[in-house]
């Protein structure tokens, strides 16, 4: 196999992150503590969220989000979801007793097709999950027009779209709850880590209890769940059916260092994006992802068309042989995954957008590193194919 000349992801770490980890080790406090709390506040302030609760992954963030809907808001029924997304966007829906209600995606933006949401709504629909795919914001004007009409909640999986904006507002803050991931391939990397964002103290308290055993020791003094008496038993009082999805203290320390690099990270990503679109924006054999709002370009999504129609797998093989890494768009049409026979869901109507992404779609990487030479190499591979 050829050496990698264009990776899907690369590290955003430098000596600062290593030193931050060493400081935590020297403190002899490895579990969630002061550095996690510091990063939570810094993240909330930077991206204009009221409150931010860190956990051990974006997947766990989604689990906490759905648990909050069930336990605090007492919602039941089905939740509208797009047919293209990630596994742990969907699984927590069922794990919290909700039914998945699939709607097709727009093959240009890869996000939920807002023209098809209303026809999927049932008397039992309680929420719409907006997944901002590959850095691209959903059409929240259209989503909220429908949600307000039917009096249903909007929640937001923003794990791939940190820092994106729609109508001047950061994604992750358009729904009543938003989630974020800090996995290696994402905009900021704590390697493993996630965040849930909300805009009120009550939700914040619920999330902090759900995050750690269901106990009350992390709750604010005026929390709605338990009146602390000051007794030694307070720290061993359990008020929600919680999990154990706390982050490590090291992850919080690294997150603070990563946030300092945010402008540098985004500058590099946008430069890579300009080069990619200069190379492929006018070509007739690839349709590139269409943005709405301000995308933060998690990666570069492509759909084979023209001379490459039906040749996606051939192209992927050629790219791999040239050292250019690629992968499916998210997980393709989720309805075609074998795990569907274990899930509780509704799927009606047309899924041609998701099918096109499944059959003709792929993406290549973007990140803090300069990938322009890799983009040039990709262009040369394609020129030899067509």
Specify the residue positions occupied by each region the protein language model found:
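Phosphate-binding glycine-rich loop
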Residues: 29, 34-78, 92-94, 102-104, ...
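PLP-dependent aminotransferase class I/II
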Residues: 36-41, 49-53, 59, 104, ...
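PLP-dependent aminotransferase-like
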Residues: 70-149, 153-158, 165
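Conserved active-site segment immediately N-terminal to the catalytic lysine
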Residues: 156-190, 205, 232-237
